[in-house]
UniProtKB/Swiss-Prot annotation:
Chief site of localization: mitochondrion
Transmembrane segments: 33-53, 77-98, 113-133, 178-198, 226-246, 288-308, 320-340, 347-367
Alphabetically ordered keywords of this record: Electron transport, Heme, Iron, Membrane, Metal-binding, Mitochondrion, Mitochondrion inner membrane, Respiratory chain, Transmembrane, Transmembrane helix, Transport, Ubiquinone
Keyword Transmembrane: yes
Organism whose genome encodes this protein: Saimiri boliviensis boliviensis (Bolivian squirrel monkey)
UniProt lineage: Eukaryota, Metazoa, Chordata, Craniata, Vertebrata
Binding-site positions, heme b b562: 83, 182
Binding site for heme b b566: 97, 196
Keyword Transmembrane helix attributed: yes
The protein, known as: Cytochrome b
Cofactor: heme b
């Protein structure tokens, strides 16, 4: 008799996606990040749901409601810090996941890659709106600075900013709508992640060698479920260590001061995971140019499948391109550092050079390296 998991309509879907899924036998721990991102999303939705039960999206009470969660709600501080540091874990896994895709040529599955880019943008929007909710100084001024970027759009810019604000400044209406979107977007992310998986399972997973793995595949369960559980344990260990021992390591002290529209903080900066994009935005003196560079810093990922000129999929056997990849990694770390520094010499010039290098490596140097390697291998 055939097992119900192979015949039952619902069980069959789960079976084909997580149990009997044919998986390459040689995929490394870099392929764990997808399941870790799923775990992060579940943690964020769960903790966020409990926080929403006690939070009030009103300029008069938002700050004190967060203080109330931390002080008076049973284990409220744990939930709050798990949610705040969970976002850092989420973005760490996201960046590593994208890096893995770049290194091993996973971007050649175009639909999966493009939906992944949309997922990144949606996650960034969600995190930005979430940062506004505690209504501290950095929440208010971060929201003011970033939403003000829309005014760079010709003709409709200023009207668009006021439409987003729901008034003439970031106020109660803005906070309410940001809370609404922050609550809804994670479910949209979950839906997009399902489509991401759907397209991935059409082609199957890539592997470190970049060669076809059709002759040598194994079932996802138990081999990779066990491997994913180990990754999950390590993720939870890191998250709980941050939450319990250093909850404020990655947050801004300014956000413990109630939002005051009459006092501007000396340095307005976003959370660490946005600093690379913020550095690119600040490196261009022109407002519209900066906004375009900011948007392109993420959208540039979508052109990577087109600029792939190598005859090999993966970077495993391509030393010149590997050097370019690690240059890009170092460059992104430099941008992250610059984004947190004040706008003065020498940080301005370092940021400008790093911004140029970021686009140059992705659009020119990596494709050029591929052509050189093709020539050397006489392919």
């Amino acid at each position: 008799m055939t097992s119900p998991r192979k015949t039952h309509p619902l069980k069959k879907m789960i079976n084909n996606s997580f149990i009997d899924l044919p998986t390459p036998s040689n995929i490394s721990f870099w392929w764990n990040l997808g399941s870790l991102l799923g775990a992060c999303l579940i943690i964020q939705i769960t903790t966020g749901l409990f926080l929403a039960m006690h939070y009030t999206p009103d300029t008069q009470t938002a700050f004190s409601s967060v203080a109330h969660i931390t002080r008076d709600v049973n284990h409220g501080w744990t939930i709050r810090y798990m949610h705040a540091n969970g976002a850092s874990m989420f973005f760490t896994c996201l960046f590593l996941h994208i890096g893995r895709g770049l290194y091993y040529g996973s971007f050649l599955s175009r639909e999966t890659w493009n939906i992944g880019t949309i997922l990144l943008l949606t996650t960034m929007a969600t995190a930005f709106m979430g940062y506004v909710l505690p209504w501290g100084q950095m929440s208010l001024w971060g929201a003011t600075v970033i939403t003000n970027l829309l005014s760079a759009i010709p003709y409709i810019g200023s009207n668009l900013v006021e439409w987003v604000w729901g008034g003439f400044s970031v106020d109660k209406a803005t906070l309410t709508r940001f809370f609404t979107f922050h609550f809804v977007l994670p479910f949209i992310i979950a839906a997009l992640a399902t489509i991401h998986l759907l397209f991935l399972h059409e082609t199957g997973s890539n592997n470190p060698s970049g060669m076809t793995s059709n002759p040598d595949k194994i079932t996802f369960h138990p081999y990779y479920t066990i491997k994913d559980i180990l990754g999950l344990i390590l993720l939870l260990l890191l998250l709980m260590s941050l939450t319990l021992f250093m909850p404020d390591l990655l947050t801004d002290p300014d956000n413990y001061t109630l939002a005051n529209p009459l006092s501007t903080p000396p340095h307005i900066k976003p959370e660490w995971y946005f600093l690379f994009a913020y550095a690119i935005l600040r490196s261009i003196p022109n407002k519209l140019g900066g906004v375009l560079a900011l948007v392109l810093s993420i959208l540039v990922l979508m052109i990577i499948p087109t600029t792939h000129l190598s005859n090999q999929q993966s970077m495993t056997f391509r030393p010149i391109t590997q050097i370019m990849f690690w240059m890009l990694t170092a460059n992104l770390l430099t941008l992250t550092w610059i984004g947190g520094q004040p706008v003065e010499y020498p940080f301005i010039i370092i940021g400008q050079i790093a911004s140029i290098m970021y686009f140059l490596i992705i659009t020119t140097l990596i494709p050029l390296s591929a052509l050189i390697e093709n020539k050397l291998l006489k392919w």
